[in-house]
Amino acid sequence: MQLKIFLFKLLFLIFFSFSFNNFAFGFFFNNRYDSNFFIDKKYTKDFIFFKKNECFSFLKYKKNFFLNKKIIIGNNHFIGFFQKNRFKIFYIVKSKDTMYSIAKNSGYNYHELSKFNSIKKPYKIIIGQKIWMGDFLIDKNNNDCSILNLEKNSIKQHNSCEVVFKNLLNIEKFLKDNIKTKKICFFCIKKIKKNNNSLKLKFFNFSNNWSWPVKNKNTKYFYIDKLGNKRIEIIGFKGQPVFSTAAGEVVFVTNLFKKYGLLIIIKHDQNYLSIYAFNNSVLVKEKDRVYKNQQIATMGLSSDTNLARLYFEIRYLGESINPLSILPKINTNI
């Protein structure tokens, strides 16, 4: 009788162990290849900010039976997970988001962003999906991260992130006492200054390699700077030739965005992109190499005015810049 009981218990333990391992393995396997899972990359890249700074609330100090403890932070745009000495930052996909729109707003090439997140053509994403945007390093040598105190009567309004996150005991104590009354803020003032200096240098060295995308004796155009989108809209006639302003590779051709009609994006040397919209027809395809002044499209009608014009934009390192600072000088505008 005792032998039977022993064998029964042994079989039960074997069955339980097998079931647990399958469940744990299935949990890991399913989540490892889901872009919503916390991705542990072999490489890292710096987080590019939407604004000059990003502040996050502490959402949880999460304990999971299968995973290690996680510090989770979040705001309206991003969610972050703490690992070792850095926060891995993810964008939360919202309604009407596309990989292109996310990449454009965050300063990335959408091919690069898709590659980082193992998202392949046709680049389908779903609401709530997490797109890895980069890492923010907690570094004692940089004063670019602070813990802000939300309590009005507090004597000390902020603390260094490095002090709080330098060891696990500090983190546990801090979050146990302060998770609802503190925010963590990342600052990128130094990075912005550095980028501005490099922009001026690149403009100076690169300006002679560009030409206007429309060839008119008297070119008429509007310069528009709206919500950080710097562009010119060149007036012409429907079917008028549109030319590549510099040599490069066609990286995007689409008609998915009704506001822009047929859209072309060309990647140039030194991290520049040129964008052509409101096209009536397109004469190139993705991955085509184009040369300066090669015809790539014909002019169409803008979506809002129904008048013939070309939407033209230049981006450097994903940031919209004034095309007039690069294109050869002309005398005529509106």
Swiss-Prot record:
InterPro entries: Cell_wall_metabolism_enzyme (IPR050570), Dup_hybrid_motif (IPR011055), LysM_dom (IPR018392), LysM_dom_sf (IPR036779), Peptidase_M23 (IPR016047). SMART domains: LysM. GO terms for molecular function: metalloendopeptidase activity. Residues 89-133 form the LysM domain. GO terms for cellular component: cell division site; cell outer membrane. PANTHER family: MUREIN HYDROLASE ACTIVATOR NLPD, PEPTIDASE-RELATED. It comes from the Bacteria. Belongs to the E.coli NlpD/Haemophilus LppB family. This is Protein NlpD/LppB homolog.
